[in-house]
Amino acid sequence: MPIVKVRENEPFEVALRRFKRSCEKAGVLSEIRRREHYEKPTQERKRKAAAAVKRHMKRLSREQARRRRLY
């Protein structure tokens, strides 16, 4: 859990903004959303494999588009 110490003469809004930023960097919200419901190990593997395929296809399409522009 990120900790933010409020400095002397620092407005609350600024400290809150720093806290939100540190939570975002630590990935607290994404972790909470991920753990909100139980996901079976097989479903987790399927989701990760699908994400890997999607990343791979995206990378391939970028490379093909780059090659088309060169000629």
From Swiss-Prot:
- Alphabetical list of InterPro entries matching this protein: Ribosomal_bS21, Ribosomal_bS21_CS, Ribosomal_bS21_sf
Any one of the GO BP annotations: translation
Keywords, comma-separated and alphabetical: Ribonucleoprotein, Ribosomal protein
Is the Ribosomal protein keyword given for this protein? yes
Output the Gene Ontology terms for molecular function.
structural constituent of ribosome
Basic residues composition-biased segments: 45-71
Q: Does the keyword Chaperone apply?
A: no
Instruction: Give the UniProt family note.
Output: Belongs to the bacterial ribosomal protein bS21 family.
Q: What is this protein called?
A: Small ribosomal subunit protein bS21
